Amino acid sequence: MKQCFFAVDLGATSGRTILGTFTSNGLEMEEVNRFPNHLIEVGRHFYWDIYELYRHIIEGLRIAARKGVEITSIGIDTWGVDFVCVGKDGGFLRQPNSYRDPHTVGAPEAFFTRIPRSHVYGWTGIQVMNFNSLFQLDTLRRNHDSALAAADKLLFMPDALSYMLTGQMVTEYTIASTAQLVNANTRRLEDALLQEIGLTQAHFGRFVYPGEKIGGLTEEVQRITGLGAVPVIAVAGHDTA
């Protein structure tokens, strides 16, 4: 029996969905749809259009459904570091900031006046870059950003898209590691860093690792696409993990 898997692969300039099928000859891959990913510039800031990305994913699922294939599971990967602020009602508070936004220039240096650079690197083990989520969040906090102040949850990009498909909020390990918030030894979010930027573990979804089930497609997505309750599985959500 053939097993078909639906992959969503999103980069900073374009995205695609792919149908991968295991046959007696091995893995066969077919591109379902391909689409651009554009930045939105508003008020000298840069944002991603997550609703447009969702629309393209839904279209890919509809095409796959029309092919009559039975999809075993769905997985999503994206670029790293960017995230969505989610309100208490479960809605997105605004479009996600892009890592290309210049508002984080000088942010690491400002942060290291409070926690030494050596401590941050010792905990996280990743390269210090001004657009890492840690510094994005600290910049938003220092600027009294209204969306962050009102946020009940923060979802990284692949987790936000899986939430739109399933209604389940998770934090996948590989994408979270790009944030410079994950302790490389414990493989969990580092409380000392969260505390410094005014956040807690409760601001993040259930921590999951690649291979774990996130949830099935919501009834709404099933109706729109013509698919059943196909499971969405946590994959290595960072596209270069």
Regions found by a protein language model. Give the residues of each.
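Short, charged, surface-exposed secondary-structure boundary motifs
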Residues: 41-44, 106-110, 181-183, 217
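Short alpha-helix plus adjacent loop in nuclease-associated cores
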Residues: 97-116
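A charged helix-plus-loop insertion that forms the helical arch/lid used to bind
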Residues: 90-103, 177-181
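A generic structural motif
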Residues: 33-36, 99, 111, 176
